[in-house]
Amino acid sequence: MNFVEELRWRGMIHDIMPGTEEHLNKGMTSAYVGIDPTADSLHIGHLVGVMMLRHFQRAGHRPIALIGGATGMIGDPSMKSAERVLLDEATLRHNQDCIKQQLAKFLDFDSDAPNAAKLVNNYDWMKDYSFLGFIRDIGKHITVNYMMAKDSVKKRLSAESSTGLSFTEFSYQLLQGYDYLYLYRNEGCRLQMGGSDQWGNITTGTELIRRKDGGEAFALTCPLITKADGGKFGKTESGNIWLDPARTSPYAFYQFWLNVSDADAEKYIKIFTGLNQDEIAELATRQAEAPHLRPLQKRLAEEITVMVHSREAYDAAVEASEILFGKSTTEQLRKLDEATLLDVFAGVPQYHVERSRIATGISLVDLLADATDIFPSKGELRKTVKAGGVSLNKEKVADAEQTVGEDDLLSDRYLLAQKGKKSYYLIIVE
C-alpha cells in the first residue's frame, strides 16, 4: 500500500493535486508540513499533520517539519477571525527546541537513512531578506487578483468580519509560498501537506514554483478534525490538550481519548495511531458486540498515550483512573504526583484547612465535622464510621477519634476523604 492509499483508507485526504500519487510512486521524495511555534508545546490539533509526516516516512519518503519562525511573527489569516500575538526571536527559538523533542517521538531525525526527518525554520532564510528584494523577486509573480480569490482572504474581508485584514497578514501567503519555493530548491521538496484550510496557501507555493522555476510541485490536505456532536476537536473546558506533561498531565491526556464518543473513536483511531486496517476492523467488531466495554476508546487511549508520553505514563494513568472506582489502595494513591492527583479529583468538592490545625494533630471527627462540613455533625460521622462508610486516603477508618497529622498528607498538602462508595472530598492544607 502506497502513502496516498494509506491516507485514503484512514480518512486523511481532503484535497489532492492531480499527479501527486503518480509523483510519489516514482521513488523517494520530500514533503513538508508547517508547524506554528507560538507555544513551547504541540497540542493534539497539530497531530494530524505530524501523523501525515509519520506515514510519509514509513512509506520510505523524507519528511520535513517546518517551524514557522518568520511566519509565526506575522500570523496566518486562514480561517482565523482576528490578528494574533507576535513573538520575539528568543521565544520562537525556545519553542522550536521544545517542539523538536516532541516531534522526535513520531519521526526519526537521527537515522543515517536517506529518508531521515529534518527540522527547518523559515526564519533562517527570511531574516536577511530585504523587503525590496522580496517584493521584487517574489511579489511580482503573484497577482493581487490571485491572492484575493483565496477563501481565507475573502472571509476576513467580508461584511461579517469586524476585524478586517492587515497588510501583514495579507502577505502571509506570499511568505508561505516562498517557503515552498525555498524547500523545492534547497531540499528537493515536491509536496506540501496541511489542513484543508491551508489549500490556498499551499497552492500559492505550487504556482510560485511554476512561475519562478518552471517546476512542478504538489499539494495534499487533510480534513479538519471535527467531533460527531459538532463540537471543536481538541478543546476541553480548561483549554487545549497539550503534549507537554507540564501543561496537560498524562492522566488528563489519557482521559481525553478514553472519553471520546464511539463514532469519534472509530474515526480517530485511524488518524492518530499506526494500527492497520485488520486491527481496527477487529476492534470495531468488538465495539459493536459490546459497546459498554469500549475497546476502541481503550486501545486509542493506550496507543496515543504511549506514543506521546511512555508506557510507564500510560500504566500510571490507568492506575490513577481506577482510584475513582474504588479498586485502588493507599499505596497507589500516594504514588500520584500532585498534578495527576488534582486532575483525578478535579470535579470533587474541595475544602481548605489551615496547616496549623494539622501540624499539631487533629482528630478525624474534628477534621470532617468541624474544620470542614463534610459531615453535618460529629454524631453522624461516628455512626457512619461504625458502619464502615468512611475512608481517609483510601483506608477504611475504624476509629472516629484517630489523629490525622502531616504524615498523612498526600504530596504534603492534600487529604482525600470518602463517604460511602462514591462521595469523595479533597481537603487542601494551606
From Swiss-Prot:
One of its GO terms (cellular component) is cytosol. Keywords: Aminoacyl-tRNA synthetase, ATP-binding, Cytoplasm, Ligase, Nucleotide-binding, Protein biosynthesis, RNA-binding. One of its GO terms (molecular function) is RNA binding. It catalyses: tRNA(Tyr) + L-tyrosine + ATP = L-tyrosyl-tRNA(Tyr) + AMP + diphosphate + H(+). Transmembrane segments: none annotated. Residues 362-430 form the S4 RNA-binding domain. Its EC number is 6.1.1.1. InterPro entries: aa-tRNA-synth_I_CS (IPR001412), aa-tRNA-synth_Ic (IPR002305), Rossmann-like_a/b/a_fold (IPR014729), S4_RNA-bd_sf (IPR036986), SYY-like_C (IPR054608), Tyr-tRNA-ligase (IPR002307), Tyr-tRNA-ligase_bac-type (IPR024088), Tyr-tRNA-ligase_bac_1 (IPR024107). PROSITE patterns: AA_TRNA_LIGASE_I, S4. ATP binds at residue 235. It comes from the Bacteria. GO terms for biological process: tyrosyl-tRNA aminoacylation. A motif ('HIGH' region) lies at residues 37-46. A motif ('KMSKS' region) lies at residues 232-236. L-tyrosine binds at residues 32, 172, 176. Coiled coil: none annotated. It is found in: Cytoplasm. Homodimer. Belongs to the class-I aminoacyl-tRNA synthetase family. TyrS type 1 subfamily. This is Tyrosine--tRNA ligase. It comes from Porphyromonas gingivalis (strain ATCC 33277 / DSM 20709 / CIP 103683 / JCM 12257 / NCTC 11834 / 2561).
